[in-house]
Amino acid sequence: MSTAIDVNPLLYASDTSSSLYDAARSFLEGVAAGPELVYLFWPTAMAYVRIATHPSIFGHPLTSREAVGNLTSLLALPHVRSPGEPSDFWATFSIVANEVAPRGNLVPDAHIVALMRANGVSGIWTHDRDYFKFDGINVLNPFAVS
């Protein structure tokens, strides 16, 4: 099963003041070790750079160079994919939108779900419970204690 990574594990791994910092770093080290196919969609990457460098969100925000460098390292791994929207993407997004009727902060999640469907990805590593609203998505919490 291929999976996608949502923005929050990336953010927790970059925020040393977070109680989830160590768990997020450990999770990303596991992702980096491979060999499972992992998707990092462009909206997730852009959200990471936007939030990780924002001084009102992070007490010690990353520089743009640091944030971009973190993603560059992740994207350089042979088992990490970053496809964009296919030419028929709007049809896929429309189906997702008709199922969930996203508004506000749920719109970016619907975008990610549509990208997942377009690329045959069924699972997402996230700490965001909103993904449970989408049918057919296996929500995987990287911080769940097993």
Model-derived regions, located:
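Short beta-strand segments at enzyme active-site cores
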Residues: 39-43, 126-127
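Active-site neighborhoods of divalent-metal-dependent phosphate/nucleic-acid chemistry enzymes
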Residues: 61, 80-123
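Acidic, PIN/NYN-like endoribonuclease modules and their adjacent C-terminal/linker elements
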Residues: 2, 113-114, 118-146
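Conserved alpha-helical segments that form or flank metal/cofactor-binding pockets of metalloenzymes
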Residues: 51
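Short, well-structured N-terminal submotif of metal-dependent ribonuclease cores
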Residues: 1-40, 55-69, 146
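Acidic active-site catalytic centers that drive phospho-/nucleotidyl reactions
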Residues: 6, 109, 128
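Structured helix-beta-strand junction loops
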Residues: 34-35, 77, 134
